[in-house]
Amino acid sequence: MKERKVGLALGGGSARGLAHIGVLKVLEKEGIPINMITGTSVGAVIGALYAQGKDASVIEDLALHLTQKRLFSLMDLTLPRTGFIRGEKIKGLLEMVIGGNAKFSDLRIPFACVATDIMTGEEIVINQGLVLDGVRASISLPGILTLATWGNRHLVDGGLVDPVPVDVLKEMGADFIIAVNVIPDIRARIHITDKDKTGKIKEPNIIGIIMQSIYIATYSLARTSLEGADIAIQPQVAHIGPTNFWEARECIELGEVAAKASIPEIKRKLEA
């Protein structure tokens, strides 16, 4: 296998993003080197953990402990000035697994996460300072989780501008890019998950409306990003609800299935 600078872009997608763990398990097993990582939203969380040197099985164990009861306990609701959920409990959980003092410069694998400046619409690439702060900004779903502050900027989820951060990897020097997208075709998602027993499309609640709006806006962006990757892995997770983190095991398995199917092409292209 030729020496290449292999970059891995892990996209956003809420609970569906747990499929990234399955992809990492397969890449590890097959000996595919990862020289740099970028992540958006849930991809930023998993990417940060992997960049710290935690192997996929350790990250998998963390994900499998996300029970429905545990998740509900993290919902510190607040008056919705910038979001329904204050996010301090979520940040506390992230601090437990990432560490409150871990810096980007401490990471074993170069890593960057992306967020969106809600005032200017700019993509903000975060690759310095505290990893915890960068990840917290990247996961801040607008209207749901309160804004994150980064210097004098107010940041929200990076998926609004770069749901699968392929171009950031190119800027970091990657010359072979594996991108993982878990944002499904919106028509497939509605067909599979949003109908009642009579076949009628359900009316979404306020959180569902916000998330649906984000998915509509980001699906086309994700497809465009994938065009810049050498390999695009797309786990079939449309039937997994975006907040169903307790379905981690199935998400991870679906990530493995998708990654295994891509291994022959990855090896062929790396050896070319």
Predicted regions and their residues:
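Patatin-like phospholipase
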Residues: M1-T40, A48-A272
